[in-house]
């Protein structure tokens, strides 16, 4: 299964319209750098995802984890429209959009 991949500008527009952006990276990765308004929901606990009536957009660092786990993410979305941020936070940053960086946090494990 694959989920539709969205460009950063599409994700930004959908967030403004009420979509939920979910960062499936581990907590340490999210603490180090994150997209504003993204909620951390590590992949390891994705089955405990809170329900959301609107669209859900998942992201990771590069897009590999979201695409590899697309079926699992769609199941966790419980019928909500589900998408992925193509290229993950790397694409978001490369498009010139801001991220929140906390240099005090240790470097993430998934490098």
Locate the predicted segments by residue.
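Rhodanese-like catalytic fold shared by cysteine-dependent sulfurtransferases
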Residues: 1-20, 24-56, 64-111
